Curated annotation (Swiss-Prot):
This is Transmembrane protein C16orf54. Keywords: Glycoprotein, Membrane, Phosphoprotein, Transmembrane, Transmembrane helix. Residues 104-138, 152-203 are annotated as: Disordered. The keyword Phosphoprotein applies. The modification Phosphothreonine is found at T112, T116. Glycans are attached at T4. It comes from Homo sapiens. Pfam families: DUF4689. It is found in: Membrane. The gene is C16orf54. PANTHER family: TRANSMEMBRANE PROTEIN C16ORF54 (PTHR36134:SF1). It comes from the Eukaryota. The chain crosses the membrane at residues 32-52. GO terms for cellular component: membrane. It is a single-pass membrane protein.
Amino acid sequence: MPLTPEPPSGRVEGPPAWEAAPWPSLPCGPCIPIMLVLATLAALFILTTAVLAERLFRRALRPDPSHRAPTLVWRPGGELWIEPMGTARERSEDWYGSAVPLLTDRAPEPPTQVGTLEARATAPPAPSAPNSAPSNLGPQTVLEVPARSTFWGPQPWEGRPPATGLVSWAEPEQRPEASVQFGSPQARRQRPGSPDPEWGLQPRVTLEQISAFWKREGRTSVGF
C-alpha cells in the first residue's frame, strides 16, 4: 500500500481573500469627457454670476440721476413735504405712461368725425347759424317754448272755465300764452314744498263724474 504524505500539523497561513479575488478593472474611458463638459458648464455659470453681480453693485454705487430719491422739504408750520421731481409735463407722462405729452402749449384740435360712410350719409346735417342782417330795432327776445311731455294728451275738460264743485287733484295750470298753439303741453312749474316739478298729468274729475261712476258700478261705498 503506497504511503501518502500527511499534511504538516499546525495552522497554515494562505493569501488574503481580497488578493485571491481582485477587483475588476472599470472602463473609465467615456467618464473623462463627460466630467470635462460638466466642469466647463459650472465654470461658465460661475463666471456669468460674477459679472452680473459686479455690474449690479457698480450701478448701486453710482445711482442714475433720472431715478434719484425724492427730496424732503420742511414747510412752514412743521409740515414735511416731498419736493416734486421734473417738470409738470414729465410727471404727467410718467404717471399716465403716455407716449404723447398730455400737457400741450396749444389748444386741442377738434376731433374728426369717425364712422362708416352709411352712418355719415344718414346723419342729419349740422345746424348752421343763420346769417341775419343786423336790425336797428334792438335785441330781439326769444320766446321760450315750454317743455314737451311725452305722455301729455289734451283732456276734454281742459279749456273750459272752472265750474263750482270741481274736485281737482292738482292746482289749476296757468293759461298758455297766445304764441303757444292749442294742444301743446303746458309749462311745468315747481310744486310748493317739493323739489319735483308738477307735470300736469294728474286727472281732474268732478263730483258729478264720481257719483255717476259709483252709480254705474252699483255701489255707494267702498268695502273691503
